[in-house]
Amino acid sequence: MTRKFFGTDGIRGQANSFPMTPEIAMKVGMAVGYIFRRKGQASRVVIGKDTRRSGYMLENALVAGFTAAGMDVFLLGPIPTPAVAMLCRSLRADIGVMISASHNPFYDNGIKLFGPDGFKLSDQIELQIEAMIEGDMTPFLASHGDVGRAKRVDGDIYRYIEFAKRTLPRNISLNGLRVVVDCANGAGYKVAPAALWELGAEVITINNEPNGININEDCGSTHPIGLMKKVHEVRADVGIALDGDADRVLLVDENGTVIDGDQLMAVIAESWAASNRLEGGGIVATVMSNLGLERFLADRNLTLARTKVGDRYVVEHMREHGFNVGGEQSGHIVLSDFATTGDGLISALQILAVAQEQNKPISDVCRKFQPVPQLLKNVRTTGGKPLENKRVKSAIDEAKERLGGQGRLVIRPSGTEPLIRVMAEGDDRGLVEKVVNDIIDVISSESSAAA
């Protein structure tokens, strides 16, 4: 069934444009509130947000929708996405909502939904919500005496800080570690520096002054250049880069080199396997993870199960097949022993634990494999279905034949933007670049011709 509102990570778009309008947000609140409201009992929803200016607008619209449906609302304020999932369980809420567009620019925003177990909603429930939004909302409204109330929650970030700190083994501290944290002017700007400092680290914080429009602006996990420079400047042991809602993380070693999610997953997988903590016989990653990671795991008799792009699909596979480590190259890392979704801070703490335990620099700990040459490029489209175009199909088939068994080709539409993502990898760097550029050229040409 074609989706009109939900993408791979909730509902997302430009603020004040369809579908990220106050009207739609209110209807989402009404529909979700009706579905999760417990008849005859007090029902509650927790709502968090990142630091985008439009968060205020959408927050108020959601409050109107949920209270109209008869649910009480707990407002958490600016807080990481994984904290919303955790607090949904901790506060025994019936539903959790995060207002965020993750790593996107400030002018975008989104709505992510979590069930009472802290996991993202199923496709079936999302389709049910879409159908309700499109119809008459009147039947979903509560009676006069059952309209909900709203209140702001105090101390919620401290609950999450304590939760995150407890994931670091008690016999390990961060004493003597100089850490630079890039908060992306986003939702982690309070919790990440506080947790690291309380665990003993010397913390130097950058991009921790959100003003509503500077979230992810030339900073955070999608723009780590500033962090690389700062680590070198202050001679830090490690840099930690979060994204706007702090559900993903990249590290920078003491030499100023970026360490992506694939390397981080390799560290955790090897460490947890050695201590018999790794479940499922391996880890779960997406089709975008590097072939080098797959080879590294295979050499240690560990498997790499691949899914579609999107941490929700990683989590679904983990739950269905008994894995406790999964993630994406982009830095979404899910450790189900601790969390139900990607958590940048907790993932970083697990890497720091390995480094402290082994008494080795981050550069030694996190260089587990030599990545296979990989190139990812995006091409913006003007609508339609370019991947069904005959010339595009022919170019893709030709590329697969040229790569043969020595590489991989992944082509997919973005779930959040009007883009086609083209990724190829293989041992021959020149061939990889040629394959990607040829496909990009054809898609761009055909898309322009169809416009």
UniProtKB/Swiss-Prot annotation:
<dbReference type="GO" id="GO:0005975">
    <property type="term" value="P:carbohydrate metabolic process"/>
</dbReference>
<dbReference type="Pfam" id="PF02878">
    <property type="entry name" value="PGM_PMM_I"/>
</dbReference>
<dbReference type="InterPro" id="IPR016055">
    <property type="entry name" value="A-D-PHexomutase_a/b/a-I/II/III"/>
</dbReference>
<dbReference type="GO" id="GO:0000287">
    <property type="term" value="F:magnesium ion binding"/>
</dbReference>
<feature type="binding site" description="via phosphate group">
    <location>
        <position position="102"/>
    </location>
    <ligand>
        <name>Mg(2+)</name>
    </ligand>
</feature>
<keyword id="KW-0413">Isomerase</keyword>
<dbReference type="Pfam" id="PF02879">
    <property type="entry name" value="PGM_PMM_II"/>
</dbReference>
<dbReference type="InterPro" id="IPR005843">
    <property type="entry name" value="A-D-PHexomutase_C"/>
</dbReference>
<feature type="binding site">
    <location>
        <position position="245"/>
    </location>
    <ligand>
        <name>Mg(2+)</name>
    </ligand>
</feature>
<protein>
    <recommendedName>
        <fullName>Phosphoglucosamine mutase</fullName>
        <ecNumber>5.4.2.10</ecNumber>
    </recommendedName>
</protein>
<keyword id="KW-0597">Phosphoprotein</keyword>
<keyword id="KW-0460">Magnesium</keyword>
<dbReference type="GO" id="GO:0009252">
    <property type="term" value="P:peptidoglycan biosynthetic process"/>
</dbReference>
<feature type="binding site">
    <location>
        <position position="247"/>
    </location>
    <ligand>
        <name>Mg(2+)</name>
    </ligand>
</feature>
<dbReference type="InterPro" id="IPR005846">
    <property type="entry name" value="A-D-PHexomutase_a/b/a-III"/>
</dbReference>
<comment type="function">
    <text>Catalyzes the conversion of glucosamine-6-phosphate to glucosamine-1-phosphate.</text>
</comment>
<dbReference type="GO" id="GO:0006048">
    <property type="term" value="P:UDP-N-acetylglucosamine biosynthetic process"/>
</dbReference>
<dbReference type="InterPro" id="IPR005844">
    <property type="entry name" value="A-D-PHexomutase_a/b/a-I"/>
</dbReference>
<dbReference type="InterPro" id="IPR006352">
    <property type="entry name" value="GlmM_bact"/>
</dbReference>
<dbReference type="InterPro" id="IPR005841">
    <property type="entry name" value="Alpha-D-phosphohexomutase_SF"/>
</dbReference>
<dbReference type="InterPro" id="IPR016066">
    <property type="entry name" value="A-D-PHexomutase_CS"/>
</dbReference>
<feature type="modified residue" description="Phosphoserine">
    <location>
        <position position="102"/>
    </location>
</feature>
<dbReference type="GO" id="GO:0008966">
    <property type="term" value="F:phosphoglucosamine mutase activity"/>
</dbReference>
<feature type="binding site">
    <location>
        <position position="243"/>
    </location>
    <ligand>
        <name>Mg(2+)</name>
    </ligand>
</feature>
<dbReference type="Pfam" id="PF00408">
    <property type="entry name" value="PGM_PMM_IV"/>
</dbReference>
<dbReference type="InterPro" id="IPR050060">
    <property type="entry name" value="Phosphoglucosamine_mutase"/>
</dbReference>
<dbReference type="InterPro" id="IPR036900">
    <property type="entry name" value="A-D-PHexomutase_C_sf"/>
</dbReference>
<dbReference type="GO" id="GO:0004615">
    <property type="term" value="F:phosphomannomutase activity"/>
</dbReference>
<feature type="active site" description="Phosphoserine intermediate">
    <location>
        <position position="102"/>
    </location>
</feature>
<dbReference type="GO" id="GO:0005829">
    <property type="term" value="C:cytosol"/>
</dbReference>
<keyword id="KW-0479">Metal-binding</keyword>
<dbReference type="InterPro" id="IPR005845">
    <property type="entry name" value="A-D-PHexomutase_a/b/a-II"/>
</dbReference>
<comment type="similarity">
    <text>Belongs to the phosphohexose mutase family.</text>
</comment>
<dbReference type="Pfam" id="PF02880">
    <property type="entry name" value="PGM_PMM_III"/>
</dbReference>
